[in-house]
């Protein structure tokens, strides 16, 4: 294919569920490649497998792509001259092309039942052979075909794979790749109901939509020789292919939808309060890297930098720790109001903040979130981070390390003195808390960790956390006095 041909790439999901992280990466790399080359990014819906399609699957895919920050030049919702953009609406395009292959003797009708095919596969496996179709319907005469149809058999259509050919292509990621045609076997291009199979529809659509580059996951590489054979049968020029390495988990195993250790769907990250810009950034680095050590880039910077030559030849590690770090970098840059907006739905869902909160409660939420602004990695994290602000005094428990601190003989007088200081206050503000702690130090003669740690542990239930005077201010006078009093009564 000519390198000067206009870049046209596509993301072609099946509407079988939510947008998976692997599919999001495929879409993103195609998007970046198109935008970098001032080309076209197309969304095509591959919905011919009606049994697997789910309600709202198509809408969910596009909604989440938009949320991540991608737009496209053609698609179901952006009509163009290469439509329709749903494969289910392109049947009238596929049928004459299938017939053309039949007429040329490059395809044939196959009447084998699923049971026969399964028996054939099992026999091949038992003999240590690679399972593939034997071609037994390849040489049926017209009379034999008519007899089969008279008996009620409906044919599928199989492509005649030429013998003893080496199918070679230069891959953008893997360099030169070759397959032997003898290992492929005649493959189905139209099912018994006349619906084309994936490989046929994809090859036809990519050609008719003038797709210049096909950038997709490594799990598709075995489809590529079949698609090239279809291109060759019609005398078409194949696109340039690029097969990205798979995404693996920390055990270096291929990311599986059954792997519960990793959240794998964009919708879930969205629901947890991750930022789209951060996910865009993280996904863009899954199997691709820029020059240098920097890891945080804007969408515009990624578009400017993106070069498929920098796609990794090694599997891409999905690192949860890295993802939360990346998201935290973006959260830290947000204005506090935006972080409150990100956090509030999760506090409300947890039932610790009113669904219909008044201005005073909203002001309090601003103070609460400000304590964790630098630390928060995503919106929902505010709930576990701030749980000590909502706990009853009676429910607070201490671990062994905390108990050891509270067992020091000076602790009761520190807590008593601090309680007395707070009881004298009309308003609990951080500055007043600081002054109160200084007065406790003067009165008791206790300073440093022996002073601060018991106060922190008894008031917050934690040894570590936000700046103590600020945390006590946000807790509020009533709650703090209750916790101090409860501890004194029990010790």
UniProtKB/Swiss-Prot annotation:
<dbReference type="InterPro" id="IPR014729">
    <property type="entry name" value="Rossmann-like_a/b/a_fold"/>
</dbReference>
<dbReference type="Pfam" id="PF00749">
    <property type="entry name" value="tRNA-synt_1c"/>
</dbReference>
<feature type="short sequence motif" description="'KMSKS' region">
    <location>
        <begin position="254"/>
        <end position="258"/>
    </location>
</feature>
<feature type="binding site">
    <location>
        <position position="112"/>
    </location>
    <ligand>
        <name>Zn(2+)</name>
    </ligand>
</feature>
<comment type="similarity">
    <text>Belongs to the class-I aminoacyl-tRNA synthetase family. Glutamate--tRNA ligase type 1 subfamily.</text>
</comment>
<dbReference type="InterPro" id="IPR045462">
    <property type="entry name" value="aa-tRNA-synth_I_cd-bd"/>
</dbReference>
<feature type="short sequence motif" description="'HIGH' region">
    <location>
        <begin position="13"/>
        <end position="23"/>
    </location>
</feature>
<dbReference type="GO" id="GO:0006424">
    <property type="term" value="P:glutamyl-tRNA aminoacylation"/>
</dbReference>
<comment type="function">
    <text>Catalyzes the attachment of glutamate to tRNA(Glu) in a two-step reaction: glutamate is first activated by ATP to form Glu-AMP and then transferred to the acceptor end of tRNA(Glu).</text>
</comment>
<dbReference type="InterPro" id="IPR033910">
    <property type="entry name" value="GluRS_core"/>
</dbReference>
<dbReference type="GO" id="GO:0008270">
    <property type="term" value="F:zinc ion binding"/>
</dbReference>
<feature type="binding site">
    <location>
        <position position="139"/>
    </location>
    <ligand>
        <name>Zn(2+)</name>
    </ligand>
</feature>
<dbReference type="InterPro" id="IPR001412">
    <property type="entry name" value="aa-tRNA-synth_I_CS"/>
</dbReference>
<dbReference type="InterPro" id="IPR049940">
    <property type="entry name" value="GluQ/Sye"/>
</dbReference>
<keyword id="KW-0547">Nucleotide-binding</keyword>
<keyword id="KW-0479">Metal-binding</keyword>
<keyword id="KW-0862">Zinc</keyword>
<dbReference type="Pfam" id="PF19269">
    <property type="entry name" value="Anticodon_2"/>
</dbReference>
<dbReference type="InterPro" id="IPR000924">
    <property type="entry name" value="Glu/Gln-tRNA-synth"/>
</dbReference>
<dbReference type="GO" id="GO:0005524">
    <property type="term" value="F:ATP binding"/>
</dbReference>
<comment type="subunit">
    <text>Monomer.</text>
</comment>
<keyword id="KW-0067">ATP-binding</keyword>
<dbReference type="GO" id="GO:0000049">
    <property type="term" value="F:tRNA binding"/>
</dbReference>
<dbReference type="InterPro" id="IPR020058">
    <property type="entry name" value="Glu/Gln-tRNA-synth_Ib_cat-dom"/>
</dbReference>
<keyword id="KW-0436">Ligase</keyword>
<feature type="binding site">
    <location>
        <position position="137"/>
    </location>
    <ligand>
        <name>Zn(2+)</name>
    </ligand>
</feature>
<feature type="binding site">
    <location>
        <position position="257"/>
    </location>
    <ligand>
        <name>ATP</name>
    </ligand>
</feature>
<feature type="binding site">
    <location>
        <position position="110"/>
    </location>
    <ligand>
        <name>Zn(2+)</name>
    </ligand>
</feature>
<keyword id="KW-0030">Aminoacyl-tRNA synthetase</keyword>
<protein>
    <recommendedName>
        <fullName>Glutamate--tRNA ligase</fullName>
        <ecNumber>6.1.1.17</ecNumber>
    </recommendedName>
</protein>
<dbReference type="GO" id="GO:0004818">
    <property type="term" value="F:glutamate-tRNA ligase activity"/>
</dbReference>
<dbReference type="InterPro" id="IPR008925">
    <property type="entry name" value="aa_tRNA-synth_I_cd-bd_sf"/>
</dbReference>
<dbReference type="GO" id="GO:0005829">
    <property type="term" value="C:cytosol"/>
</dbReference>
<dbReference type="InterPro" id="IPR004527">
    <property type="entry name" value="Glu-tRNA-ligase_bac/mito"/>
</dbReference>
<dbReference type="InterPro" id="IPR020751">
    <property type="entry name" value="aa-tRNA-synth_I_codon-bd_sub2"/>
</dbReference>
<keyword id="KW-0648">Protein biosynthesis</keyword>
<keyword id="KW-0963">Cytoplasm</keyword>
């Amino acid at each position: 294919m000519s390198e000067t041909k206009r870049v046209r790439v596509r993301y072609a999901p099946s509407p079988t569920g939510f947008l998976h992280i692997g599919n999001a990466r495929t879409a993103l790399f195609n998007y970046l490649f198109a935008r970098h080359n001032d080309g076209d990014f197309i969304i095509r819906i591959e919905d011919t497998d009606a049994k697997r399609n789910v309600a709202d699957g198509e809408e969910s895919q596009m909604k989440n792509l938009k949320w991540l920050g991608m737009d496209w030049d053609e698609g179901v919702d952006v009509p163009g001259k290469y439509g329709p953009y749903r494969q289910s609406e392109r049947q009238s395009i596929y049928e004459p092309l299938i017939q053309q292959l039949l007429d040329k003797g490059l395809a044939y009708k196959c009447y084998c039942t699923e049971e026969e095919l399964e028996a054939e596969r099992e026999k091949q496996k038992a003999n240590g052979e690679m399972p593939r179709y034997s071609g037994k319907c390849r040489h049926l005469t017209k009379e034999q075909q008519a007899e089969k149809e008279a008996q009620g058999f409906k044919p599928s259509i199989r492509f005649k794979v030429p013998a003893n050919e080496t199918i070679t292509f230069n891959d953008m990621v893997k360099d030169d790749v070759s397959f032997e045609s003898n290992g492929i076997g005649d493959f189905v291009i139209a099912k018994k109901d006349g619906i084309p199979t994936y490989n046929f529809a994809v090859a036809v659509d990519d050609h008719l939509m003038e797709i210049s580059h096909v950038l997709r996951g490594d799990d598709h590489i075995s489809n590529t020789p079949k698609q090239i054979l279809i291109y060759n049968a019609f005398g078409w020029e194949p696109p340039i292919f690029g097969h990205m390495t798979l995404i693996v988990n920390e055990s270096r195993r291929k990311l599986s939808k059954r792997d519960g250790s990793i959240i794998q769907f964009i919708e879930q990250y969205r629901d947890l309060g991750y930022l789209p810009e951060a996910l865009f950034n993280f996904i863009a680095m899954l199997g691709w890297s820029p020059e240098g050590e920097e890891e945080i880039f804007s969408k515009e910077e990624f578009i400017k930098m993106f070069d498929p030559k920098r796609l990794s030849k090694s599997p891409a590690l999905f690192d949860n720790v890295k993802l939360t770090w990346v998201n935290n970098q973006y959260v830290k840059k947000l204005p506090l109001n935006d972080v409150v907006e990100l956090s509030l739905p999760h506090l409300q869902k947890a039932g610790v903040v009113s669904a219909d909160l008044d201005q005073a409660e909203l002001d309090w939420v601003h103070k609460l979130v400000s304590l964790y602004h630098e630390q928060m990695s995503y919106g929902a994290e505010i709930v576990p981070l701030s749980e000590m602000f909502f706990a009853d005094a009676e429910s607070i428990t201490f671990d062994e390390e905390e108990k050891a601190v509270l067992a020091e003989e000076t602790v009761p007088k520190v807590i008593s003195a601090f309680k007395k200081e707070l009881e004298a206050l009309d308003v609990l503000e951080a500055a007043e808390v600081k002054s109160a702690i200084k007065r406790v130090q003067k009165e008791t003669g206790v300073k440093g960790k022996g002073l601060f740690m018991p106060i922190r542990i008894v008031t917050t239930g934690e040894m570590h956390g936000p700046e103590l005077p600020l945390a006590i201010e946000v807790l509020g006078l009533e709650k703090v006095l209750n916790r101090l009093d409860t501890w004194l009564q029990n010790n």
